[in-house]
């Protein structure tokens, strides 16, 4: 019999062993964990027991994997040649093993602390360089969520550029992908922008148009030269966006040369599995003059204090965490890990390898055309890349035979059943072979009662198939990084070199407040590599995706049970998109009950910047609510605001526990006040890790809540994505959840598509399924309890050294605590950034700095860290306090000290000349245990201002930059 206690997953997920829990509880003055939790979570919302009857009993790792495998087998693996933005591709094994499956890459956080993030910053810099080379535009960001979202961001940017005019029309090519059009319509409606879908051959642009979106190649496969149309649009100051296929762009002239303003697309074809629609890294490239309007992260080059080249996130003043309701976008989490994979895919293949893949696709498509003509099929003689559409009476039989032979073809018209099909389309991809072509041709010939004789075209010239637009004529991707690593040995070492320059959970605790950097267990991640999940196209017939249907339905039910809500949508593929979706649901409900004028959204001043940015995107006007000395919403100010805006009140956005790290005792009264005046309560689930199994937002008054599966439910952060931000809603809002059908909807009340895939980032949902399945109700409650216990232990231990800024009246915090360093700055000049950089020398990633209050550190240990690691962090902070005291007492110089000069690199401490008033050991090994396990910052402190003044977002080579 298996030893179930020894194999209990929660024992491996939870960091505090029983003896440590007892020691902490004694230090905090509590008899047991239940007594402690009762002192933290308000009694009126605390559940006595987790919702056992609605959640499964915990399974161990082996049992959970077996159960999930049985679910995965409900999906049917076939070769999908459907296209429409999703294609078969091969992730080189060296990239799968050393990046995709490597916790050094997938457990790191967004690279805000750049000195210990040079590896992933370089990988993302390579991605940006790849995109600028593909598009011919000078600025590219470090990824967006998907192609549909990228198109919506391009529309918003185009409107922002032309906001002073009366233009409100956005022209969309009728060849645009259906999911992109669906996302555009959703985004345009609350902003009162007009979307007009047209055949571009008939288009006449005038002063009412602010932007234009072209799809090249179009969904039917056509390629054409848009130069004259671009020139026409520019006559009326309209911005032109082109959605491009990156493999097609390998061969055709860069769009920047044709005059486009913005180029977008998906990098999925560059080694990222289809995964039922996501996650995939979109790209966004733009002309120089619009660089300060670019959405998402932007990696730029700067210099460190030694004058060495260094990378960091550039132009951050554009972003929502600073600009709030005036931000260029609400995008926070993007798709960093997938962009990293795409960049390594380009490094692996190099320019010539990518060209050969693209040429083979064209060859197969051209051969298919020749054979189909011989069989008697007819089609327009257009210039095409990978796709061929055929309309014929035999379509239903062709689809039936294709499926029997293991192929999915695109059903025409889109959204039709096989029985009502009027045609088919074939989209070739990297995995396509002549063998597959011949199998398909045999089907097409048999249906027409024709003979098929395979033959090879030895005289094929791809240029003859691309005659309708200019081709790429000059060498590209000449940078060393895309040409140096032709052997696996060299590529493996390059990947490892970059990984070693990054701090991740492999190296130590990442105590970022509001980020929940908990364990991402290997067993949770293993299933996402299974073909049954990774190879399924999002538009396959529903009977081929029953596994995804079963998994998503089960996961939605569990999330409803844990939150106390009645319905869940898994479609939003980031927390920011969950916010947007939730607010649109509220807005749709108000419209449905004839109260469309309710457009005021109340938001506490402590809220995360995505909240006001999302509210504006959803068509709301933001009104701020004050906070009190304990970090709670100022109830008197809330009452004043709801009464002032009673007839216009649409929603209150509130984070719980608050962004100040406390459980607000009157949360029910807050919700009641909003409801009394006709509003709805949107609860930001960023801090749900303090609630799971303890209390349920739907039970204490919230109407909508988004959940960050990449925080609370163990999807790794990946250095800045992927993420999933599903929304859970109360019963009266269920009908308004996002539509899953991009072609037609049976539910007219549903808001439109939020992401470019019906199930969002579907392929990583198994991670959260595994976490819940292995933890069970009791394990989840224990996780929340220990996360809160660890945070209170840190607050209690560090309180004599640093002021804990916000506490409940009984001295307790929630799952995170905020240390106030502002008085230290006034006395010594030492800033919070100095402490953050000094923590790198101690072997830690810094907590969240200067948010939600400037000059503070917000610490969240999570439930996964051990007592030893938590104590090591506390020891580091206490040691740093002693270094500050030495400055305050005059023992240490105000400017020449370990904090001001942190972080200390290996180059610095091994230099022949050491002219600092502290020892090399104090600089690099301030804790005794570091001699055996030292993480070195890759660069000295980076000059952020220099990087923004001299913006460089792509380059010839990093090596060449280091010489300049």
Curated annotation (Swiss-Prot):
Residues modified as N6-(pyridoxal phosphate)lysine: 711
Pfam families: GcvP2_C (PF21478), GDC-P (PF02347)
Gene Ontology BP, a term: glycine decarboxylation via glycine cleavage system
Keywords: Oxidoreductase, Pyridoxal phosphate
Catalytic activity: N(6)-[(R)-lipoyl]-L-lysyl-[glycine-cleavage complex H protein] + glycine + H(+) = N(6)-[(R)-S(8)-aminomethyldihydrolipoyl]-L-lysyl-[glycine-cleavage complex H protein] + CO2
Gene3D superfamilies according to UniProt: Aspartate Aminotransferase, domain 1, Type I PLP-dependent aspartate aminotransferase-like (Major domain)
CDD domains found in the cross-reference section: GDC-P
EC number assigned by the record: 1.4.4.2
SUPFAM superfamilies, A to Z: PLP-dependent transferases (SSF53383)
General function of this protein: The glycine cleavage system catalyzes the degradation of glycine. The P protein binds the alpha-amino group of glycine through its pyridoxal phosphate cofactor; CO(2) is released and the remaining methylamine moiety is then transferred to the lipoamide cofactor of the H protein.
Protein family (similarity comment): Belongs to the GcvP family.
Family matches, as PANTHER family: GLYCINE DEHYDROGENASE (DECARBOXYLATING), MITOCHONDRIAL, GLYCINE DEHYDROGENASE, DECARBOXYLATING
HAMAP family xrefs: GcvP
Name of the molecule in the record: Glycine dehydrogenase (decarboxylating)
Source organism per UniProt: Prochlorococcus marinus (strain SARG / CCMP1375 / SS120)
Record gene name: gcvP
